[in-house]
């Protein structure tokens, strides 16, 4: 996955499911806090915390119908697991944040 200038709005694959609307909205509402926690972990060089947060987001994003967000979180999880340097990890967190910024209900 590459970071691009794509500004296309991302909606959940389940956005038209009335049973999912409220929980998707909650997921989107809580997404900034998840990203903030990841930035705090990155700034503190707490790679284990960052890996855990990315792993959790990877699963949640897929479950709420945001596969691109899940793929970006998986890349962070992978980068930490294989011991990539902070520049690679920081780049992947930036990519995740850019994708998250495109998400709408």
Per-range role (PLM):
Residues 1-105:
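Two-component system phosphorelay core
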């Amino acid at each position: 996955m590459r970071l691009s200038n794509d500004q296309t709005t991302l909606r959940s694959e389940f956005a038209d499911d009335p049973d999912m609307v409220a929980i998707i909205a909650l997921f989107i509402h809580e997404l900034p806090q998840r990203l903030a926690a990841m930035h705090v972990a990155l700034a503190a060089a707490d790679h284990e915390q960052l890996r855990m947060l990315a792993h959790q987001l990877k699963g949640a994003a897929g479950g709420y119908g945001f596969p691109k967000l899940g793929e970006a979180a998986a890349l962070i999880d992978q980068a930490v697991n294989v011991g990539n340097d902070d520049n690679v990890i920081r780049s992947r967190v930036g990519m995740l944040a850019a994708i998250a910024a495109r998400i709408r209900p």
